[in-house]
Amino acid sequence: MGSLTLVLVAVDAPMARAWRTLTEGRTGLVVHEGSITDVDTDAVVSPANSFGLMGGGIDAVYARWFPGISDRVRAGSGGELPVGEAVIVPTGVERPAWLVSAPTMRSPGERLPPDGAAARAAARAVLRLWRDGTLPDGVRVRDAVHTIALPGLGTGVGGLAPDVCAGQVGAAWDEVLGEA
């Protein structure tokens, strides 16, 4: 299996601290402080809603960066992608070539429960897609995607605390790739 570098993106100090704690004792995780648009990566993660509507938070950034991406996400998911599942679609630009949609909420604007279960489900879906999924041309995702930039999952619109998000992403990493 190929190796994955997961770039944990923090736009503020609390998220950066939480991500740094997560990287302790784990290889393959690096922290980037700043905009996700500055990360040189193969794929970015959209912690969108199940309907692929991309009008708020990081998804609004993606909608401006990758024209038509919301339509591609909806087409790739059949119109609704449940929390805990992920789909990978082309961005239409050279880098990052791919966007992974992994919803943290069903409907736009939902506040997430404080336990962070949705962040864990989304992170697990991203990592399983990388480990087991295929691109539209049949190439295994893990053979084509070596870096994925991950923003806080549910920490913006969803209102999840950064430390809870980081803990849940770490649990998903250990569960899915801990033996990789």
Question: What kind of region is each of these model predictions?
Answer:
Residues 1-180:
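Macrodomain-like recognition of ADP-ribose-binding/processing modules
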